[in-house]
């Protein structure tokens, strides 16, 4: 299939659609409308139709979408048949939680190596994942051909650690540190700031309260 250019917002929604289509398929449902899909994933139906339009004719007017066909299509688009090994860099509280989780709800992503400086956990297996000393990171990333990593180190060590990851061939980082990393143009960084997300949620809740008072 030719490469399809889609907006970032659309790309973020594709896994939502895919997960719900898995549910519908497991329930034995054969077709779904954009309205039903919108209610389930909390995305308006116009956005769903626009998202799907980037991939051509996926449904029929008046019929909706064939669940099995749509599921197979997004399975291919999201590369669900290929296992992606991910490195976890930093096994503190957040890193430990991610190790325990280890994407058990997905079949195509797993944390296969973790790195830390704590001698009490390096050289051990945690939640089925080997934990290496940070001094081995570049060597292990290269040998295991890992190109995606989750960064959970303290903010003060984030950029230095990221630079070493770039040198080892990392092409994508999910950054759980508060620092906005300086990265080469060839590397994609996805920032995950839980404090900011919570503050945004609180802001909207407070705004809703103010509206209700009027």
UniProtKB/Swiss-Prot annotation:
Q: Principal localization?
A: cytoplasm
Instruction: Name its cellular compartments.
Output: Cytoplasm
One Pfam family hit: CoA_binding
What is a single molecular function from GO for this protein?
DNA-binding transcription factor activity
Which residues are listed for NAD(+) binding in this entry? Answer: 90-95
Tagged with keyword Cell cycle: no
The record's section on InterPro entries has: CoA-bd, NAD(P)-bd_dom_sf, Rex_DNA-bd_C_dom, Tscrpt_rep_Rex, WH-like_DNA-bd_sf, WH_DNA-bd_sf
Q: Which domain of life is it from?
A: Bacteria
Please list the GO biological process terms of this entry. negative regulation of DNA-templated transcription; response to redox state
Q: Which UniProt keywords apply?
A: Cytoplasm, DNA-binding, NAD, Repressor, Transcription, Transcription regulation
Sorted alphabetically, the Gene Ontology cellular component annotations on this record are: cytoplasm
Known DNA-binding region: 16-55
Q: What does this protein do?
A: Modulates transcription in response to changes in cellular NADH/NAD(+) redox state.
PANTHER family per record: REDOX-SENSING TRANSCRIPTIONAL REPRESSOR REX, REDOX-SENSING TRANSCRIPTIONAL REPRESSOR REX 1
Belongs to which family? Belongs to the transcriptional regulatory Rex family.
What is annotated about its quaternary structure and interactions? Homodimer.
Q: What is this protein called?
A: Redox-sensing transcriptional repressor Rex
- Gene designation: rex
